[in-house]
């Protein structure tokens, strides 16, 4: 039911080459970290995109409200909870695909995690449940498409 990969580049981006690329806007001052499931609880169903983004943000000391609901609700509900929501891509934020937007599920939408913002405005994201439940994958979203999405900064 997802058609998200219809909108990305066909080759998987290599995150290893970014290990030594730290920009001044990188607040974590750390290189790429492989995904590790947080041992704490999550209110999001395991393997879903919402679960993954919740877990991935915790790896970088960013926390997202535990009851934002389906992916396409995250931006509006996060704004009501006092989170910064912007249309400008930023590293280590949640990116929200509205229901049906850029191939996202037409009922639930989709969320992913921004690993890197490239100089040309494209973004590299990591996500779960695009290639199968609990399967973590990476892709590049071009600058034009990235500018249509909302980004949530954790607390």
Language-model features and meaning:
Residues 21-111, 127:
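Secreted/periplasmic proteins that engage bacterial cell-wall peptidoglycan
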Residues 1-21, 155:
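N-terminal secretion targeting segments of exported proteins
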Residues 115-155:
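Aromatic- and glycine-rich peptidoglycan recognition patches
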